């Protein structure tokens, strides 16, 4: 194979490797964004009203926001 053919194949290989590397970076950024969204949603679910906090404080528990509305519990998950 001529020197020019080897150079062309090398160039194609480098282009392919660079494109593959960029795809991996985009995938990693997408995964990182998805994790950040999950964290924000988790914190939003913990938003509770002062009334709930006062009611649970009497029972020495924390006010947790669930699908069915606020409730008192020793630990909040989610």
Swiss-Prot record:
Any Pfam family: Conotoxin
GO molecular function: ion channel inhibitor activity; toxin activity
Leader sequence segment: 1-19
Modified residues (Phenylalanine amide): 77
Propeptide: 20-44
Cellular location(s): Secreted
Record flagged with keyword Disulfide bond: yes
Disulfide bond positions: 52-64, 56-72, 63-76
Entry's Gene Ontology cellular component terms: extracellular region
Keyword Secreted set for record: yes
Entry comment describing in which tissues the protein is expressed: Expressed by the venom duct.
Keywords: Amidation, Cleavage on pair of basic residues, Disulfide bond, Knottin, Neurotoxin, Secreted, Signal, Toxin
Domain notes: The presence of a 'disulfide through disulfide knot' structurally defines this protein as a knottin. The cysteine framework is VI/VII (C-C-CC-C-C).
Homology family: Belongs to the conotoxin O3 superfamily.
Designated name of the protein: Conotoxin CaFr179
Lineage: Eukaryota, Metazoa, Spiralia, Lophotrochozoa, Mollusca
């Amino acid at each position: 194979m001529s020197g020019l053919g080897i150079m062309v194949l090398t160039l194609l290989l480098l282009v392919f490797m660079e494109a593959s590397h960029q795809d991996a970076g985009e995938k990693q950024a997408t995964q990182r964004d998805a994790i950040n969204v999950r964290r924000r949603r988790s914190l939003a679910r913990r938003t509770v009203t002062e009334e709930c906090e006062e009611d649970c404080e009497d029972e020495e528990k924390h006010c947790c926001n669930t699908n069915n509305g606020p409730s008192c519990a020793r630990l909040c998950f989610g």
